[in-house]
Amino acid sequence: MPKVSVVIRAKNEARYMGETLAAIRRQSYQDFEVVVVDSGSTDGTPEIAERHGAKLVMIDPKEFTYGRALNLGVSRSRGEIIVSLSAHATPEGEQWLGRLVSGFRHRGVAGVYGRHIPRENASFFELLGMKLSGITSLQPKIHQRNARFSNANGAFRRELWEMEPFREELPGAEDIYWARRMQRLGYLIVYEPRAAVYHSHGEPLPRLIRRQLHDQPVILRSWLGSLFEEQPVKEKAEVRGGQFIAK
């Protein structure tokens, strides 16, 4: 079984951090470490992380971007498979980690992401957005083009991250940008709904709109890249009849 590193980006996440770390520790897949990248918490989040045995890494809030914080956490980790998890995304059940990792049985898979189960505080508009994005779906999916991906509940191969780290200058959607880069190199992205987390933000509509305005230019940029960049020289894998065919 591959060694796994769970990397969590956090700032003032005391409300859910303990719950999330406790759920990780209950996983049946036990060959893992936890790295928490904190960007200036003032509510005791770092202390909670250390109390649960996580390795704590600090990043200056002035230097923070989602991609930079994740790259820093991965650079301080040792796993062959990296799981990126939001501090307020609590794994459901004891098979969550094993189900994410099982998606890498095929060498052609670059990333695996799981389902998001909205918390009770999710607003109507947040629920609608989650449904439209597909991250609440119960249907497994293998993406060959225009993948969704989520660093709130996703995993990727370290060797591919070393080749293509997350873009640190992007304001958001670094996960989707990376996934579509992997697809253009011939890799697959897998959606595994059984690897679920409880996750939502409880945000009002104005903040949801700001988040979308933040992310959509990056998503559009990655989509345009898929139209105009050259096709991969060598396909790593393909899917026939819903099954992986390694090449």
Regions found by a protein language model. Give the residues of each.
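Short beta-strand-to-loop acidic/aromatic patch adjacent to the donor-nucleotide binding site
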Residues: 80-90
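Conserved donor NDP-sugar-binding/catalytic core segment of glycosyltransferases
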Residues: 90, 94-125
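Non-catalytic, C-terminal membrane-associated alpha-helical segments of glycosyltransferases
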Residues: 206, 210-247
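A conserved acidic beta->alpha catalytic loop
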Residues: 38-46, 90
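Glycine-rich, basic loop-to-helix element that forms the pyrophosphate-binding segment
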Residues: 60-77
